[in-house]
């Protein structure tokens, strides 16, 4: 697959803007779990030679990969769905939080108004309470202009050495 450097220009789509924010904040490792809403970002990550992309099969596995990248001196990020947040609780608490590892988590926030898959709705009710219970800061992107906050959120995540959830809902992706 063709690898390219940082993209530029006014016509840049939201996925490219997200990846450029990753590069600007020196994120060099991204692991992803397949998600239809996040497919554009995953494709954009794959195109950049500044980012080592490792797809994974399970979000808890992705937490371990990110921990390894961080311990190896590379800033990590995981891209995942909120419906799998529950399976990452142990990895987040016992590994990422216990060892004070910064980890931005770009999470598709499935299950809100406009969701077409009924089974996604239940986890949407639990996503924010789980993050609050774990003391993980979360930011909810509803509209395309919310992307303007991403660089500051990433910078804060690495400064504070804590995981952070960036929840991007269907309205964010449809507005992009």
Regions found by a protein language model. Name each.
Residues 2-176:
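Thiamine diphosphate
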């Amino acid at each position: 697959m063709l690898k390219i450097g940082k993209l530029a220009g006014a016509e840049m789509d939201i996925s490219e803007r997200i990846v450029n924010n990753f590069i600007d904040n020196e994120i060099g490792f991204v692991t992803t779990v397949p998600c239809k809403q996040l497919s554009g970002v995953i494709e954009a990550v794959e195109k950049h030679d500044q980012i080592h992309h490792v797809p994974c099969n399970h979000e808890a596995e992705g937490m371990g990969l990110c921990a390894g990248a961080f311990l190896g001196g590379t800033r990590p990020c995981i891209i995942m769905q909120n419906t799998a947040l529950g399976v990452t609780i142990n990895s987040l608490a016992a590994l990422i939080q216990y060892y004070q590892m910064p980890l931005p988590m770009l999470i598709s926030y499935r299950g809100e108004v406009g969701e077409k898959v009924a089974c996604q709705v239940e986890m949407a009710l639990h996503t924010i309470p789980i993050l609050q219970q774990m003391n993980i800061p979360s930011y909810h992107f509803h509209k395309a202009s919310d992307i303007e906050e991403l660089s500051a959120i990433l910078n804060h995540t690495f400064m504070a050495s804590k995981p952070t959830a960036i929840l991007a809902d269907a309205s964010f992706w449809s507005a992009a």
